[in-house]
Amino acid sequence: MEIGVIGAGKVGKALVRGLLDAGYDVGGIACGSAGSTGKAAAELGVPGMTPAEVLEHCGTVFLAVPDRSIRPVAEELAAGLDTGRKRLDVGIGPDIVVAEATGLESGSGGMPEKKRDRLVPPEDAKTVFHCSGAAGTGELEALAAAGCRCGSFHPLQSFAGGPASWQGVYVALDGGPAAVETGEALARALGSVPFTVPAEDRALYHAAACVCSNYTVTLMTLAQKLMSRWTGSGPAGLQALLPLLKGTVANLERAGEAASALTGPIARGDGTTVEKHLAVLPPEFMALYRGLGLETVAIAPELDDVQRKRLALLLEGAECLPLRKVQ
């Protein structure tokens, strides 16, 4: 089975490298311009093609493009495909789409129940995945109407652009049964762990991923800003903090439940240290420190009720700060 990739950003390149390492034949890659396509093809060692050629030559195609580009790219690709197929099932949940010879109707647009057929696509149907975490399979409805099996294939990983390991990476899938089956097989071949996130849950799933990945960077940036006061520069501040972050990740890997990896003053019920923090933090850090502190109090597994209440009062600002008499 030849596999094609449209888009050569971090995810697209990681897909090509992972598929090649897994022994798949990557039949082509396409980008937004001939120059970008040629550069990516040379870097990855696969044929460069136009997007239409990738879909024509490959049985399975990944759209590794920005979320805003998924629908227009799908529509452009679909324009070159045969739209005469009578009916097929292309998704599940609210993104189910039924294509007919006379047009396309969506389950979210008031389709009559009698038309909610779940028929199997033809054996020679192409399979197209987008790689968005937040978007549903409805973004591919033009390709579905043209006879493709459609799904989403989102690696729960932040790719840095260089060689990337897919081992142990969870891959969130959605789509029709045949597309999900193909996605599961590909994920396992990459060494990844497939699981299903239905369309109605994609935004919440993506929010969880953003909290883990994106907001960790935000927190590290704020910590770096403080630490650089003593290390002499921002980069040195980050380097000073990285061993601490790596140790935290190692604790999380061993813990199983995230809360079990918690350390620090709140974990041990040390209100005195929390008071000291609140006394010296710059004003721009205060709301975030208090908010995260309250969430930490809620999850800290070793606190008793008295400690939990005392810490919550401190963080809510109901008690006096250090250097003043504590009521």
What function would you assign to each model-found segment?
Residues 1-53:
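NAD(P)+-binding Rossmann beta1-loop-alpha1 motif at the extreme N-terminus of oxidoreductases
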Residues 27-31, 128-131, 171-174:
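Short, hydrophobic beta-strand segments that form beta-sheet elements in well-ordered domains
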Residues 34, 38-39, 43-103, 112-164:
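Rossmann-like NAD(P)(H) cofactor-binding subdomain of soluble oxidoreductases
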Residues 40, 143-149, 164-254:
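Internal alpha-helical scaffold of NAD(P)-dependent oxidoreductase catalytic cores
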Residues 106-108:
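Serine residues within intrinsically disordered or low-complexity segments
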Residues 248, 253-307:
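Interdomain hinge/lid region at the active-site interface
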Residues 307-327:
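NAD(P)-dependent dehydrogenase/reductase Rossmann-like domain
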